[in-house]
Amino acid sequence: MKLRKIAAAALLAAGALTAAPASAFVLGPTSPGKWGPPAFGTGATISYSFMATGTSCGQEFAGCTITALADFMPAGYLGAVTSALAAWSSVANLTFNLVADDGLPFNVGTSGELRFGGHPFDGPFNTLAHGFFPPVNGATAAGDMHYDTDDQWKVGFGGNPNAFDIFQVTAHEIGHALGLGHTAVANSLMNPFYTEAFSGPQADDIAGMQFIYGPPQTQGVPEPATAALLGLACAALGAFGRRRRAAALPVA
């Protein structure tokens, strides 16, 4: 199987990567490095939205423009993204609420705390996506996720060997958006290599997320109403490629 990078993109922020005590999971570089109350082990309710095609992402690179997920991903992408959110809320004290995106540029809009969109990265088979760490992380970029529009995407494992499963990549990037860094644990979702050997968060990933937000209290991802989805553009800031790499975005 070809390996692809999963990149964690983060605005320059104070704080070094820190491994949580007695575990292999790695926390992100921001402080407090989570949503909701700043104390580790406390839950959070987090909003998310889908950026529309044409939304500016010029703070990433000159001329950058977002493409909605609906405009480059296959049918079923929305269910895959929702399932990735649910995979995390089922193992930690997290609730996700869909909101309408305000259409403002990347790192300016204040609609969804997690904003999904896509744009070209570095051609196919390299970095697949990137995700921005939680606050404090430079204005409103925190939590945003972008997919590489030059790569091919699919729903489910198998099939096209040159395409990448939306759920698996999204779940990895959400991990970054919620506060986890890359781990050296081989069979972990937060390892920087794309794989179809397992699906979703594994033991080390779950331990890390529960360290940040505590164990689950309720199921946290209600199905979005059909009417609420009409007209919403899909975008994502995930980071899978041959290897997930950390890329820094300078603060303007």
Describe every region a protein language model picked out.
Residues 9-16:
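Bacterial N-terminal signal peptides
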Residues 9, 212, 230-232:
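Generic alpha-helical secondary-structure signal
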Residues 238-252:
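C-terminal membrane-anchoring or membrane-association module
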Residues 222-241:
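A short, hydrophobic C-terminal helix/tail in secreted or cell-surface proteins
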Residues 20-225:
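Zinc-dependent metalloendopeptidases
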Residues 4, 175, 222, 241-242:
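Residue-level micro-sites within transmembrane alpha helices that shape
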